[in-house]
């Protein structure tokens, strides 16, 4: 009887260790399976309102997708999710607020893609921190300094900022790396040069041989 109890305790201990390892692995991989969405409103020089839809990945703060419209609807928003994640690349979880823009057509498309929606609490933007932080950076580092004439000009500006954010903008949480990781360049590679980005609002620095 005593030996049976010892054997049972050993089995329980092994199972607990395995469960702990699985939980740690799942928690480590969770950010790779979460994306967040949100809208921001941009006013043109003629006071026309344009709505920008953004998709941001929790893993390495990737800026995944954007588009612009003057008339946001559930069908249009659902189409953006399909364009952002083609060919079975959909995430597991989609975090967004309770805006009525996310209507029945949106819910249906997301469910068809196998994505689980996670809704923030009412009036709780801090629960969607990654998307809110990205939108804040986009305003402070880009849109607050540029006059927007129309939808096409806004798309051009956003394209350059998304490229800058993905390839060059550093983050403390990424140990001063960019979302698309950059290799450390040694002094032997040459002198440091600056490459203007986002119309000269920002710069990327690289080493190039003379």
What would you call each of these model-derived segments?
Residues 1-210:
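Charged DNA-binding/catalytic regions of mobile-element recombinases
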